[in-house]
Design a protein with these regions (language model features):
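Amphipathic alpha-helical segments
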Residues: 28-41
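C-terminal structural segments of small proteins and small subunits
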Residues: 83-117
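Terminal, regulation- and interaction-focused segments at domain boundaries
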Residues: 10-31
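Ser/Thr-rich, low-complexity intrinsically disordered terminal regions
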Residues: 41-65
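Structural preference for solvent-exposed beta-strand-turn elements
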Residues: 15, 19, 49-52, 76, ...
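Beta-strand elements of well-folded, non-transmembrane domains
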Residues: 25-27, 58-62, 86-88
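Beta-strand/loop substructures that line and gate deep hydrophobic ligand-binding cavities in soluble
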Residues: 62-86
Length: 118
């Protein structure tokens, strides 16, 4: 059976690697919504104009991570704040690249954007 929302929430408690980037842009809400709609075709996505939460399954695209990862995005007036919670440092690094590439696709007029992961 497919994992339930509770299963997904419990898997989040096992995550060990987190990073946040404050990406300079005044179009954060637009990019957040476009990317959320794009990912909602294949991933569990919840979003509003200002907030998005995307769950990347541990076995997405043939991967074998120890737990699901969660990407949250918050649209601020001058930044798009992106946080990744992953199961390992390697998982985190892989998702940093995935997220940056996808945001840059929707932000093509001002890409590449600066992701100051910290």
């Amino acid at each position: 059976p497919a994992p339930t929302f509770t299963d997904k929430m419990q898997s989040e408690t096992r995550m060990t690697s987190t990073s946040t980037a404050h990406v300079p842009t005044t179009s954060g809400s637009r990019y957040l919504q476009q990317l959320s709609k794009h990912w909602s075709h294949n991933l569990d996505v919840q979003f509003t104009e200002k907030h998005s939460r995307i769950i990347f399954p541990k076995d997405a695209r043939g991967a074998n991570w120890s737990a699901d990862a969660v990407v949250t995005m918050e649209a601020q007036p001058e930044t798009l704040d992106v946080t990744i919670e992953a199961s390992s440092p390697e998982h985190l690094e892989a998702l940093k690249g995935t997220v940056a590439r996808h945001v840059d696709r929707f932000a093509f007029r001002e890409a590449p954007l600066t992701f100051d992961w910290g």
